[in-house]
């Protein structure tokens, strides 16, 4: 055969070689290279993340997720992996932050890329909580909503005008507690609802019987915690499940979502339309909603105001209730703190009047009690998750675009490098005395970070101060007793929701003296005969 092969023969010979099973084709080589590249990229990416437990193939760390008290679960990561760690579940990266300075470095200093929220299919898309500020995606709509709320209550100067409302409603709270102390939790909710609904919509609650709007807000809040429970809803991992027909097995979540959606829309729509009717009739009281609507907003901004107002009373009410419930619990658990606080009030204010916000600067121990309530058990112990919108690198670790960042506020508040004997309730830690350097003010961590920090913290802070100071001025708070006169130890546990409330506990609330009871009764008759807007809702 001629050693110089013709082109046709060479082509035929090459085809035979490529058709041989044992010969690797160019396509196979390319696929192998691509596979190795992707696998290598994944390994490098995984190794570049903050340290964390090794996951399973495909599902990752699905077995490493907590079912309750996540703040304690994630706090253990700090001992094992350090102050920043990570897990990956179904391809989704989670970054757990257990040190305050890291949270500040990321969520405050780099808030431009750390201010988004994760997309929650069940709570956000199906129930509509992504319309409210708490789960709204970061963008123009969120910025407008936050701007409106901050303008209304975002500064000390802005909240001064609401002092009379806060003080009178707190006095009404004292009267209700005096009448039925066994319903303390209900009185806390009613008072918070009265303040925030008056501010958000100019709405006067019903004090004679359970108020329909207050109940609706509370129902929606409870459903929010159910809807946002981590890992509870498979549709969050597999959004395509929404498209299954309602009769298909396993789609009960669609019925639940429809019910929750109705309650969520109703709690936003009913008070908003109430204000519009009152404005048309010329009888609307000044409020956040009426002030915004007077600007003649277009349909787009009208919708923003509707949900900004919902954020104002919905978010504000529940967080204040949780904090004040924790306050009453600590007074039962730490009676020596209560005695010191009462002594300060008696010395500075006397016993013939109630403390007011004007007295705040003269009551440093009461101020310290408030701070310790915020620290001892942060009512949002895991904060609200942030989502990073760009790849970032922190201390050599990759935080990939789309990662969900979980700031462990509880760990920040129990960091032994910041707070000694952190599990103890010790207001003295904030006082500057001989030999004592004040520890970190928990306001630095309790209200969130960056552009997602709570815009209503000034208002919440003044509400808490008034309730704490006035309650200690006139009430003794102690352990409840059973029918045989034996003291009942209060339950010292907290729920695992986004807002963490003390679990139901019993306590005894009694007037400190006859003169204290008289101070309470000065407003008692007035609050029982107040007009209500409940019938016009």
UniProtKB/Swiss-Prot annotation:
**Alphabetized Pfam families for the sequence:** p450
User: Which keywords, in A-to-Z order, does the entry hold?
Assistant: Heme, Iron, Membrane, Metal-binding, Monooxygenase, Oxidoreductase, Transmembrane, Transmembrane helix
PROSITE patterns in alphabetical order: CYTOCHROME_P450
Q: Using the UniProt record, name the top-level EC class of this enzyme in a single word.
A: oxidoreductase
Q: How does it sit in the membrane?
A: Single-pass membrane protein
Protein name, please? Cytochrome P450 monooxygenase claR
Which pathway does this chain act in? Secondary metabolite biosynthesis; terpenoid biosynthesis
Question: EC number(s) in its UniProt entry?
Answer: 1.-.-.-
Q: Which organism is this protein's natural source?
A: Ampulloclitocybe clavipes
Which residues hold heme?
A: 454
Q: Which family does it belong to?
A: Belongs to the cytochrome P450 family.
Q: Where are the transmembrane segments?
A: 23-43
Cofactors needed by this protein, per the record, are:
heme
User: Is the Transmembrane helix keyword given for this protein?
Assistant: yes
Which transformation does this protein catalyse, written as a reaction? (2E)-geranylhydroquinone + reduced [NADPH--hemoprotein reductase] + O2 = wigandol + oxidized [NADPH--hemoprotein reductase] + 2 H2O + H(+)
